[in-house]
């Protein structure tokens, strides 16, 4: 069974050589865009964050001049919560700014590339992104995009099936691509997400529970969820399944995005990860809200993380 799933996910679910959970679905951040608006304005899906900024501003300005005063260029998750950690990690990693804490436990967030990434995002506020994005989670961003009032959106794969639903005003007008690079020297970076299923040691019916886990993580159920809900399978073979690709074409085109997604530093920071993430998203949110400058905020963040880990030596 383990060989049928992405190896990295199986490794993540293995403790002391024993498989303790089963991969259920894999997530990674994606860029959604309005195919019709890009075609109307002679634009292509952006390859860099600068291209996204320029394209979003251009289309937003022209659409507003034509009477759509609710149009915004780009919506995403800017609330001070785990979703902002995911968004900001994508910005930072795409600029070659690292992943907050490296695999050896060294704190790396205070660097020029990371500061550039966060400052770039701060420049979107009240230009191509509404000020309200500072309190957006996934559903707030999707609400604006799916109502037809945004050119671009960063979100997870689940938003695809909803945008394509019978009640959606943008049905058949949505495209999906990899997130932009942080400049010509950068690379596309998508934060890894997803879920696993396990059986509690305190279960009164461990065998029944294990059977349920195997059913829910099996090929039939993963295929159904991929087709009906755009949940990315953890089973490699389903990325070549014609019915899955017909329902969610991006799963084939963006296969490498999911395989090479950037992991949050939860493994190396262990039980302190929640504190690390909390410090990170608050530092980023402060910059986005215009309360601090990126360089100063990241320097303060690095100092806080060093205190938390005794200089990165004790996570």
Language-model features: where?
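Short, solvent-exposed loop/beta-turn-alpha elements that line the ligand-binding surface or hinge
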Residues: 1-5, 64, 73, 78-81, ...
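Short helix-loop capping/hinge motifs at secondary-structure junctions, enriched
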Residues: 36-46, 62, 98-99, 126-127, ...
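Paired acidic/hydrophobic, glycine-rich loop segments that form the ligand-binding mouth/hinge
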Residues: 151-155
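Short helix-initiation/N-cap motifs at beta->coil->alpha
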Residues: 49-54, 133-146
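Glycine-centered hinge/linker elements that transmit conformational signals in sensory
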Residues: 56-58, 103-135, 179
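C-terminal lobe and pocket-closing loops
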Residues: 158-171, 182-282, 312-315
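Hinge/lid segment of periplasmic solute-binding proteins
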Residues: 1-28, 69-70, 84-85, 171-179, ...
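Extracytoplasmic/periplasmic solute-binding protein
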Residues: 11, 15-24, 29, 53-106, ...
């Amino acid at each position: 069974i383990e060989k049928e799933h992405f190896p990295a996910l199986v490794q993540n679910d293995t403790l002391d050589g024993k498989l303790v959970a089963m991969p259920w679905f894999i997530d990674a951040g994606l860029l959604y865009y309005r195919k019709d608006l890009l075609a109307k304005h002679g634009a292509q899906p952006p390859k860099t964050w600068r291209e996204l900024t320029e394209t979003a501003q251009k289309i937003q300005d022209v659409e507003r001049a034509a009477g759509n005063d609710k149009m915004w260029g780009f919506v995403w998750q800017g609330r001070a919560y785990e979703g902002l950690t995911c968004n900001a990690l994508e910005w930072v990693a795409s600029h070659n700014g690292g992943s907050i804490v490296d695999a050896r436990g060294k704190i790396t967030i205070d660097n020029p590339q990371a500061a550039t990434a966060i400052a770039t995002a701060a420049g979107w506020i009240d230009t191509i992104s509404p000020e309200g994005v500072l309190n957006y989670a996934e559903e707030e961003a999707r609400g604006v995009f799916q109502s037809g009032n945004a050119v671009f959106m960063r979100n997870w794969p689940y938003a695809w099936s909803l945008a394509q639903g019978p009640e959606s005003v943008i049905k058949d007008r949505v495209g999906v691509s990899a997130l932009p690079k942080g400049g010509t020297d950068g690379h596309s970076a998508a934060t890894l997400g997803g879920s696993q299923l396990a059986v509690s040691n305190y279960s009164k019916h461990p065998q029944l529970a294990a059977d349920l886990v195997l059913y829910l993580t099996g090929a039939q159920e993963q295929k159904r969820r991929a087709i009906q809900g755009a949940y990315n399978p953890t089973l490699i073979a389903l990325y070549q399944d014609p019915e899955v690709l017909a329902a969610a074409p991006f799963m084939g085109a963006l296969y490498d995005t999911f395989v090479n997604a950037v992991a949050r530093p939860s493994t190396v920071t262990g039980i302190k990860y929640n504190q690390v993430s909390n410090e990170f998203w608050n530092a980023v949110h402060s910059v986005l809200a215009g309360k601090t400058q990126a360089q100063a905020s990241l320097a303060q963040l690095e100092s806080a993380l060093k205190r938390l880990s005794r200089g990165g030596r004790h996570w």
